[in-house]
């Protein structure tokens, strides 16, 4: 059997959905299968390009809900990530749990001199055309706080 001996590289950067925020908790019934409705607890983070995509890392940062100032104490939570086959995510068989990122409790203020440490999941994953990645939170962030999920990758 002949193998592909020529490495392939992504053609176009794909940084996922801009301003992907999760701030409230998913319902217990949806928290393990990725079937939540898209909203403040569950958000689309990435869509693969027409020829598929490669993802290098997923980062979770402390942020604020749109139009708000980041100030207060974040609750500790887990951000769960699901790979969806491009079909309706509210059908459990269309989703696969991709990974989890633990985010510790953190007090933030907008003009603080303290650096908030992002949580990074190095993943190196090739995904088929049209597949999506969704992110959801297991615990509400609190107040006007939210976690921003960003994905670094590219389209083939």
Model segments located where?
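Extended extracellular/luminal ectodomain segments enriched in beta-structured repeat modules
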Residues: 49-57
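Short beta-strand/loop motifs in extracellular/secreted proteins, especially
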Residues: 56, 77-79, 143-147
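Buried hydrophobic-core signal for structured, non-transmembrane domains
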Residues: 58-61, 133-135
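Short amphipathic, basic-aromatic surface patches that mediate peripheral association
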Residues: 60-70
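Short, surface-exposed beta-strand/strand-loop-strand elements in extracellular ectodomains
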Residues: 68-90
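Aromatic- and Gly/Pro-enriched, solvent-exposed loop/edge beta-strand patches characteristic
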Residues: 91-150
């Amino acid at each position: 059997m002949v193998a592909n001996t020529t490495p392939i590289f992504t053609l176009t950067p794909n940084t996922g959905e801009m301003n992907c925020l999760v701030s409230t908790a998913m319902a217990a019934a949806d928290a393990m299968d990725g079937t939540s409705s898209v909203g403040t607890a569950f958000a689309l983070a990435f869509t693969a390009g027409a020829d598929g995509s490669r993802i290098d890392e997923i980062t979770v940062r402390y942020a604020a809900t749109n139009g708000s100032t980041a100030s207060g104490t974040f609750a500790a939570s887990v951000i769960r990530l699901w790979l969806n086959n491009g079909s309706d995510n509210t059908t459990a068989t269309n989703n696969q749990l991709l990974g989890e990122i633990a985010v510790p409790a953190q007090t933030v203020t907008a003009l603080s001199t303290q650096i908030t440490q992002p949580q990074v999941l190095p993943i190196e994953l090739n995904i088929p055309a049209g597949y999506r990645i969704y992110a959801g939170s297991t615990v509400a962030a609190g107040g006007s706080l939210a976690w921003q999920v960003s994905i670094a990758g590219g389209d083939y």
